[in-house]
Amino acid sequence: IPLRFQVTEFDCGTVSLLNAFSYLFEREEIPALLVKSIFKYTLDCYDDKGNLGQGGTSREAIKKLTKWITNYTSENNFNVKCTRLEKEQVTLEKMKECINNNGVVFIRCYQECEHYVIITKITKNYVYIFDPYYLERNEYDNDNSVKMILNKPFDYNRRVTIERVFSETKKDFSLGSVYSR
């Protein structure tokens, strides 16, 4: 099935996690308990008015969910491995290794604020991302580092330079400072 877009301003983490599993598995292979747990752990942050979920998904929630998935896969017949990387552990080589082993990379990057997306392909110069935030086709016309891809709904919808992804800026799709990764 095609990968999905966010239904709110805040559910990029939830949707990107669901997209990661949708990319890796057929619908009938995805356990309902996994989907339920993604919804349980994500959207755990409050906005400045105290509204739960409207602050998105925290790093701590992703850490806990990674642990839950690891435990679940060790106790059940579900073949997936989650490895959580931080700071200087986040390297292009590790991302390529994941992709080359038929995996998906779930990252927290920037898009005006912290934002979650998945990487499904890496080439010599580019990272191919599925961004769950729907944008108009001309959004990146003035940004040479990002290209909208509209004809790959099962795989990706952005092509981003590797240089941009690993820049220590807060430009769209940058991972930002090494120490905040």
What are these regions (language model features)?
Residues 1-85:
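Cysteine-nucleophile protease catalytic domains, especially the papain-like/related folds used
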Residues 50-57, 87, 111, 160, ...:
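Alpha-helix N-cap/loop-to-helix boundary motif
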Residues 99-101, 121-181:
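Noncatalytic regulatory segments and standalone regulatory/sensor domains
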Residues 65-73, 116, 137-139, 143, ...:
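A generic structural signal for ordered secondary structure
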Residues 81-134:
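Active-site-adjacent substructure of cysteine-protease-like catalytic cores
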Residues 31-35, 119, 151:
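Generic alpha-helical hydrophobic packing signal
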Residues 31-35, 114, 134-136:
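Short Gly/Pro-enriched loop/turn and capping motifs at secondary-structure junctions
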